[in-house]
Each structure stands twice: as C-alpha cells, then as structure tokens.
Amino acid sequence: MNFKNTFFWFTALLSLLLDHLTKLWVVKNFALTVPPQTIPLWPGVFHLTYVTNTGAAFSLFSQGGEWLRWLSLGVSVGLMALAILGPNFNRWEQAGYGFLLGGAAGNGIDRFVAGRVVDFLDFRLIGFPIFNLADVFINIGIICLLIAAWGPLPSRRRAERRPSSPPPSDKLP
C-alpha cells in the first residue's frame, strides 16, 4: 500500500501535538482567574494569558456556539478524506491542509472535551484578541494554500515559458 500525502499527515500530527502540549502546559501552570493570570514575556507587547473561549476566533459566536464542535469535526473528517481519497497534493497544499487539520482538530478536541477552547497567546501591542497555536496553524494553513493557488513564483513561470534553444547543429555554416 502506497501511503500518499505523507507531508500532510506529518504537518497535521505535529501541529496537533504542539497545540495540545502548549494548552496542557498552560492549564497545568496557570490559574483560570478573573482578571486572567498573565505573564509578560515582553511587557506591553506579548504576554501569556490564560483564558477560555466558548466561541470561534475573536470570541465570535460565544453565545450558542455549540455547533462549532460539529463544524470542527466535519472539517477534520473532510480534510482527512481529501488526503486519503484525493490526489497527491504538492508540498504547499499538503502543508496547508495539514495545518488546517491540526488547528481544526486541536480546537475541536477542546470543544468536545471541555466545551471551550484554551487561549493564551496575548499580543497586546495592537490589542489583538487572545488566541492559541491552533488558531496560528489555521492561519498558516490558509497562507500555504494561497501560495499553492498562485502557483510558481513569477520568475519561475518566465523561465518555463522561455523557448528552449534549438539543439546544437553538427553542420557549421
């Protein structure tokens, strides 16, 4: 049996593992308090702050976001089916879909197990909502898929369009 899209599976498992381990570390080492416990890594710019979120990114749908667990499950199953039943993807596509799966599964597991997602990355410089590695991986996945959709870089496309030189001739003029 030929196992295809191996980079997809590697990316998905690695991103899921990193997301899970960082959330586990936060839960074990921080108290869930009001106001939230925070550790400034770069004061005023970047902190680790333990909060939970029952909604989606930026706390959207935090009221009645029960359906988000099923959306996470559906996206995860769909991406796995695509990797198994679909074509062999290029590296950018495999990375993109893998990061999407890792992020969707990471937040989905939180939603099924605890009913909420653990967030802890607090970028305060621009007042950004607190997020987690799963959110980062989902965004990286989207960027990878955009790169894949745009195809080769323009310089590479020009080289591919350039007509090849005729083969050298044995006859001299």
Curated annotation (Swiss-Prot):
It is an enzyme of class 3 (hydrolase). It is a multi-pass membrane protein. Its main location: membrane. Pathway: Protein modification; lipoprotein biosynthesis (signal peptide cleavage). One of its GO terms (cellular component) is plasma membrane. Its EC number is 3.4.23.36. Keywords: Aspartyl protease, Cell inner membrane, Cell membrane, Hydrolase, Membrane, Protease, Transmembrane, Transmembrane helix. The active site is at D119, D135. It comes from the Bacteria. The chain crosses the membrane at residues 7-27, 41-61, 70-90, 95-115, 130-150. This protein specifically catalyzes the removal of signal peptides from prolipoproteins. This is Lipoprotein signal peptidase. It comes from Cyanothece sp. (strain PCC 7425 / ATCC 29141). The gene is lspA.
